[in-house]
């Protein structure tokens, strides 16, 4: 059994007053257990009359033993990026639809959550990707992603033309709607919708998936996660592109720009109930056939 948690940070889906009731339910449960509760400042805006200590996201990551995230996978992705340097474990209370990352239901607070707070849980680590942009002899860090980093066209439906390099070696040039570079965590997200494979979450790998490529020979490619992926916008490209991390607002790209994608130092810690089974989640969410007999 792991060490029980004592100081809990609570974070909710931003700018969504509908989750106030669920947040209150979780907060009341934690206080009833005699735990110290801190609340994220932005989340605190949903509780004008709250009496808990409101702290910045950074301070929450430094002072708390555990961060409980109330929302869906999108909320947990956002929190994972913002707390990536803290090393704090994350626990997701599922209010969204898919729930690949957040898997504790609000009605299971008295069972699953109580056991996890007492130290009965399973922990796994996921790596993140970092994106860097080289533009006009300048280099910029532009974002972090737990799921994927996507290069694509802005606003209009048109092909983008680019070249891809892996560890400095030319891979290919292509015309497509874009390219998704995904972690194992993100292999069940946009990359899957684009026709990519599902990667085991424990693999040290990432997958490159073309979005609607002009040439059908452009197939998904799984590579070592310690590789450096470079995407260079072709001189023949006529439409502005952009690069996005986990579906966040993108950074504009122009001819000659180079996007570098590589594994970010450090890992995200996720904790789950002891009965957590990733393959069971895949079967349920993707509607796979059950075992016969």
Swiss-Prot record:
Gene3D superfamilies: Probable inorganic polyphosphate/atp-NAD kinase, domain 1, Probable inorganic polyphosphate/atp-NAD kinase, domain 2. InterPro entries: ATP-NAD_kinase_N, ATP-NAD_kinase_PpnK-typ_C, NAD/diacylglycerol_kinase_sf, NADK. Its EC number is 2.7.1.23. One of its GO terms (cellular component) is cytoplasm. SUPFAM superfamilies: NAD kinase/diacylglycerol kinase-like. Its cofactor is a divalent metal cation. GO terms for biological process: NAD metabolic process; NADP biosynthetic process. The active site is at residue 73. It catalyses: NAD(+) + ATP = ADP + NADP(+) + H(+). Keywords: ATP-binding, Cytoplasm, Kinase, NAD, NADP, Nucleotide-binding, Transferase. NAD(+) binds at residues 73-74, 78, 147-148, 158, 175, 177, 188-193, 248. It holds the Pfam family NAD_kinase_C. One of its GO terms (molecular function) is NAD+ kinase activity. It is found in: Cytoplasm. The keyword NADP applies. PANTHER family: NAD KINASE. Belongs to the NAD kinase family. Involved in the regulation of the intracellular balance of NAD and NADP, and is a key enzyme in the biosynthesis of NADP. Catalyzes specifically the phosphorylation on 2'-hydroxyl of the adenosine moiety of NAD to yield NADP. This is NAD kinase. It comes from Nitrosococcus oceani (strain ATCC 19707 / BCRC 17464 / JCM 30415 / NCIMB 11848 / C-107). The gene is nadK.
């Amino acid at each position: 059994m792991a060490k029980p948690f004592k100081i809990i940070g609570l974070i909710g889906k931003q700018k969504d007053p509908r989750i106030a009731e669920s947040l209150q339910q979780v907060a009341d449960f934690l206080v009833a257990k005699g735990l110290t509760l801190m609340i994220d400042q932005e989340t605190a805006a949903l509780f004008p009359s709250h009496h808990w200590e409101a702290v910045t996201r950074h301070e929450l990551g430094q002072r708390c033993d555990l961060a409980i995230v109330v929302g869906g996978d999108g909320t947990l992705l956002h929190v994972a990026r913002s707390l990536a340097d803290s090393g704090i474990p994350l626990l997701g209370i599922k209010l969204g639809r898919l729930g690949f990352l957040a898997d504790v239901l609000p009605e299971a607070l008295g069972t699953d959550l109580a056991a996890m707070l007492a130290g009965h849980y399973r922990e796994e680590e996921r790596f993140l990707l970092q994106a860097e942009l080289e533009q006009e002899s300048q280099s910029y860090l532009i974002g972090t992603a737990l799921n994927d980093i996507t290069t694509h066209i802005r606003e209009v439906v048109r092909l983008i033309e680019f070249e891809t390099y892996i560890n400095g070696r030319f891979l290919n040039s292509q015309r497509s709607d874009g390219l998704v570079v995904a972690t194992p965590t993100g292999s069940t997200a946009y990359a899957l919708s684009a026709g990519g494979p599902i990667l085991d979450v424990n693999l040290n790998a990432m997958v490159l998936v073309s979005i609607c490529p002009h040439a059908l020979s452009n197939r998904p490619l799984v590579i070592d996660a310690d590789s450096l992926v470079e995407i260079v916008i072709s001189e023949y490209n006529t439409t502005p592109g952009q690069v996005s991390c986990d579906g966040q607002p993108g950074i504009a790209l122009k001819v000659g720009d180079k996007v570098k994608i590589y594994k970010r130092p450090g890992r995200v810690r996720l904790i789950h109930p002891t009965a957590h089974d990733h393959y069971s989640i895949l079967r349920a969410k993707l509607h796979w056939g059950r075992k016969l007999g």
